[in-house]
Amino acid sequence: MPSGTFLVARSALFFLGACVAVGALAADSPAHFDAKGKLPSTFTLELRNGLKAELPFVDKRDFDEAKKGFIAEPPYKQIMADAGHVAWDMASYQWLLSGQDFASIHPSLQRQAVLNMAYGLYEVVPGRVYQVRGFDLANISFIKGDTGWIVFDPLTAAETARAALELINNTLGERPVVGVVYSHSHVDHWAGVRGVVDEADVASGKVMLIAPAGFMNHAISENIFAGTAMSRRTQWQYATLLERNPFGHVDQAIGKNVANGTVSLIAPNRLISENIEEITLDGVKMVFQDVSDTEAPVEMNTWFP
């Protein structure tokens, strides 16, 4: 037998033997493959109970603050992707609202996960600034101009950003999008842009798309160089591949999860390159402050005088 054939045959036998061994293990130890995994140990429960007693969980002010300005929520809990699958599913987290104290979840994580159940349209500054929350990992903000909306940070997916725009238009009245702002280069703050504007309107100047200088370079390069590693880290850090329940995926701390929809990008037509720059768009005065190399390689704060 040629040596190559021998190696292939030996590898096949080894693989078959491994499969038989794993199959036997699975048959003998079905609990090992329980989707719950191991229940919390006595040590873990004692540690958790100690934290529960030590931290100020009786302070409910954050829950009161999170409810302020609530206007409306949509009649649905799922947002479908253009490809036909579910892009966003708040229904899968409703168990968090049962009021139950889950021994398998760190108490601070459970508290944050409940706070992140905010879902719908909120008024931040009366008559001027609004947010749609709970449609993606980040929040999308809408500033009311003289004639239209200035959209801040259009989420991760075109479908969730589009749904947010539809919600605010259906609730407060139809207005065109006259501007978009990318606050920084992380994907959850720009990849839904094609859900709120058309590229032709940006190219023609009909819509002003504002971003910090160097945005395109860092938005693309960071995901090329570090995207795979960041995705794998997220899967481990937030258990995003597990079922959504007290023994699996619970939350992603700054939001529920990342929307699984259409990732898009439109190049900005107005860059902020100075430390401080001022722009007035549709009657709204905005002062931009460069804060690059803080939370992102390129980033800016925006002040509304």
Where do the PLM segments sit?
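Bacterial N-terminal signal peptides that target proteins for export
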Residues: M1-L13
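N-terminal signal peptide c-region/cleavage motif recognized by signal peptidases
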Residues: C19-V22, A26
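Active-site metal-binding motif and surrounding structural segment of the metallo-beta-lactamase
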Residues: T147-G148, A158-L209
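Conserved beta-strand hairpin/beta-sheet module of binuclear metal-dependent hydrolase folds
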Residues: V114-R175, E299-F304
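Solvent-exposed loop/turn segments at secondary-structure junctions
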Residues: D136-N139, T156-E159, S185-H189, F215-H218, ...
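Metallo-beta-lactamase
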Residues: E123-V124, G173, I210, M216-D293, ...
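N-terminal pre-domain segments of enzymes
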Residues: A27-A113
